[in-house]
Structures are given as C-alpha cells and as structure tokens.
Amino acid sequence: LIQKLDYINDGDPETSSDLGCNGIWLMPVMPSPSYHKYDVTDYYAIDPEYGTMEDFETLITECDKRGIKVIIDLVINHSSSEHPWFKEACSYLAALGDEEPSLEECPYVDFYNFSKEQLDGYSQVPGSDVWYYEARFYYGMPDFNLYNEQLREEIADIVDFWFAKGVGGFRLDAVKEYVSNDHPASTQILTWFTQMVKEKKPDAYLVAEAWTDISAYSGYYDSGIDSMFNFGFADSEGIIANVVKGNKQASEYSRSLEEIQDLFGAHNPGYIDAPFYTNHDMGRGAGYYAGEYSPAQTKMAGALNLLMTGSAFVYYGEELGMKGSGKDENK
C-alpha cells in the first residue's frame, strides 16, 4: 500500500496521474484468526499478515505528506472467541458450574452477554453444559455487552491508542447489531461512542455501517455521527445500477438525492453523506452489466457515485473495472 500511495494521491494538485483521493479506509488490520479480520484478538496490534506496527506508522507518515487521512475499521460489536477477555470469561464460567458469577473474580464475564438459557443467537460456552453466550454472526464472534462501563473504558483506551498512531477516524461495523433488533438502544450506544470520540478529537471522521433500508439507517444520524454508508444507491439492485441499466428513469437518481438530503438532514443537519457503489460484501460493479455497452455502463455508474454529495467511497479496483464475485475472498 505504501508503494501505491502516489497512485492514490501523489500530493501534487498539478498532476493528473493519481486518483486524487484524500482518504483511505483500511478494513480490519488488527490480529484475527480469519481472512476478513472482523473477529479481533488484540485491539492494540497489527496482524502479521499485513505487516508490523512500524509499517503502519510509516504508512501514516507517508499519507500525511500527501494530504491523505487514514480511517480504520473498529469492530466493537463483538470480538473473536480467541480474544483473551472472552477466553478468561469462558474458563471462569466453565469452572463455576451452576453458581452465579462474581464480577470481582472475573470482570470479563460482563464484557459479553452470557445466559443459562440457550436464547436465540446464543452458543454454548466451551467446557460448560450450563452457560451460553450471544454470538449473532457466528459462534466465533461473541457479542460485547456495550452497556458495561469497564468495557467502554477499554474501548475509549483503544480509541486513544489509534489516535496516538495518527488515524483520522474510524469506520464502525454492524452498528445495528450493537443491541440486536433494538434500533433506539443501538442508536443510544452509537451516540455514546460518537460523543466520546469527538471529545477526544473534534475533527475525527466517523462513518458507520447499517446494512438495512434507507428509512432505518437514516435514523442512526440521530446519534450525531458524521456519516452512514448510503446503501440505497449501492449494489446490483441499488438506485445507481437500476438507472444505468435503464430499469429506472435518470430523474429517479436526482429525485432520490433530494429526498435523502431532507431525510438525513432531519436527523442530523451536519451530516456528511457516504455514498458508495459496491464494497467487500457485494459483487464487483463491473459484473452488474452485460453486453457491448457494459464498459460504458460501468464508467457511468462510477461517475454517478462520485457526483453525489459528501464523502464518496470507492472500493479498491472499482476505478479499473475489476471483476469478482461469489466468495468474499474473490471480491
């Protein structure tokens, strides 16, 4: 990535050989047992597959020279089941049996959501036939209890650590799952996080993911967060693709832009839209079209994404018409 920075932005406004991007979003870079790294085992380190902390610091330095801000994925909805906090809590509960846990003996028990009932979305604690834990995505991603004050202090410390490393902000994963099936509660937690971050660094940029419909994710702007990814325009059935395919009139694009300005602005007058056309969870944009006009359609779709207000995001390779679909690793 460091070697390709001049392709992203060479820092010279007089040249035209770079993309001219002023920000980079890094998907999870922290140690994790998975290929996608959304299940973190250490929030204070760099996964060896990507390099070292020294490499990261060099990246920040070189980006600063070019006027590029770096934001990183911060996954606080859940950790890896291999995280020391979770492993210690599970070991404690397995030894405890049917007795009630003591937070003085093991405070990490309250970092997660444990129960003696196998509730929906819960998996069995290893080594125990009594205890279960919430893991909505899958058993290897135990959900945090984001109401726990000690955990919140840990998250604040993590934010401090990465600000000290020079990051300009964070992308927040799966915010609608902070409290699953409870939009007001998830918004409340997002409000806490946003306020905490802005007190530390007022110019920090925060963008969050809530993969749902526009009427639902617009409500998260009540938290005061800068941006929510604008899913309504993205993917193969989004507004952009449907206009480019001819399934919708071009006027639908402009009308929708006017509508979201009113909708988002009603929740947060200072919002910054975060349009994107495709991402790591979707097929590549170049695969949305077929036939002799597909290259032109791909270019037009990319242009419509960049024409939107706010901070447009471009998934790497989209500027080249890169293809890929199916498994996440192929995207």
Predicted regions and their residues:
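Active-site groove signature of glycoside hydrolases
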Residues: 76-78, 140, 156-181, 270-282
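Generic hydrophobic alpha-helical segments
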Residues: 1-8, 155, 159, 260
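Conserved alpha/beta catalytic core and glycan-binding cleft of carbohydrate-active enzymes
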Residues: 82, 87-89, 94-116, 194-195, ...
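Glycine-centered flexibility sites
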Residues: 20, 37, 51, 166-169, ...
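Acidic/aromatic-lined carbohydrate-recognition and catalytic surfaces
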Residues: 1-150, 164, 175-223, 231, ...
